[in-house]
Amino acid sequence: EARKQLDLKIPYIIMDSDDPLDVARLNTGRKNWSMENYLDQHCARNKMDYRICRNKMQQYGINVAEMVVLLLKQTSLWSRISNDFKTGRFVIPAGGIEHADRIGSQLMQLKKYFYGMESTKNKRFKRSMVVSYIVADKHPKFDHRRFKTACKSKSSWFLTGTSTADYIAIIERIYNAGLTQKNKINLVEFYKTKEYQDK
């Protein structure tokens, strides 16, 4: 309206398209959209799987990329998964919500031990911490109850971590403290060899 009153041209584009994503593509301009921008776009279009994703993010304080990984029962955000998410083809498989709820509730139980594990910007778990826990959960010998008990006296160890590899090593040290050799887990090796991707 202001441009009209000032007798300025109003730029617009007319295009023949039935794809609502064209609006998103045009609005990206020079700056690429984040996963959160795409989530907002698809939620505004009332796509149920995206609305579930947003709800679970808020419920557990987990960022969009990690929640997508959890809902798809994966360990990494592969480019195909990312592209499907951006283009509106994200579909939660059977058991995906239950998987996300299980991991999300375990992280919430551990939250009080994770000093500094929240992003100061949005109060969500740090990405590297969530990814390291997803990897740990894939280890065949990992037991959440054992880890939770071990965290009670060793949670300050988390203060030294900054990356996923750091947190993997810290989880391994905390988990293995006081265990006999046969009950220990080799989480660092499990992570380095990417065995978790096959689980």
Labelled PLM ranges:
Residues 2-199:
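Accessory terminal alpha-helical modules
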